[in-house]
Amino acid sequence: MTQTLSIAAKSYPHTAFLTDPGFTVAGRAVELAAADPIYKAFAPMVRELRYDVSELAIATFLQAREAGAPIALLPVVLSGDFHHHSLTRWPGSAEINPADLAGRRVGVRAYSQTTGLWVRGILHEEFGVDAKEVTWVTTEEPHVASYVEPPNVERMTGKVLDVLERGDVVAAVLGPPALDGAQGPLVPIIPNWREAEEAWGARHQTVPINHMLTVRRDLLEAEPQTVSALYQAFGAEIEARKAADTAPGPRVRALRFGVTDELVAGLQIAIDYALQQNVIRTPVTVAELLDDFTRHLGELA
């Protein structure tokens, strides 16, 4: 009997095809992992290779690669967004200028959370606030067990929203699920954030990457045709979704398939920000991130 292919991916319009009982990959049936929210799949993937294929946050992949995890990155962006609006304060709390966050406490689910990577990069790039000048109050450990957090990272219990509501932090970084599920309107602290987001996009010629597609390296090496077929299936769905949207917002514009200029730009900025913030400590190039894909799927893709 042909072995089932295990895949961990969030339910998006462009991943709905994975739930079709008739969908197979090179003759292999697909078993979709139950991981909700999807970031619950990230630690099992990087620590124990629990899945054959997994959606993975780009910051987690950068750390996993540095730690030597045998996982390969495919040039498929499953989610992304601008993140100026992700830095928020509690309604009714004191207003604060982003430039004044140095020396203050800011909440974030984990220091290695990708939304936090982007927000810290924005603070440094646009407001002159270095990541090491802020105390980052976290509620979860890194997905990569061997990662050592900077000394200005603290841990608290509960959820980031609870920490923010209690006033233990002056602001908090919240990813899309937390923002979408918040009770009441949180207040973005970056002024004119919509305009600032579009200006960032114009300056960098990309939309920030949150999650990409990864595969166990041994599967890629042993069955490149299988991985290629799955890669093409994801690509077809992404291209169809983008083509169907005549006025795409940033979450649709962020979707990528293939090695495009926008993908390369997004990966390079993620690398730069990660090095600045000690999310990773070893320099790496975009070509090195995509080396497994290029060697094994370059001709097939």
Predicted segment positions?
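Secondary-structure end/capping motifs
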Residues: 214, 219-279
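Hydrophobic/basic alpha-helical segments enriched in Actinobacteria
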Residues: 24-34, 186, 276, 283-286, ...
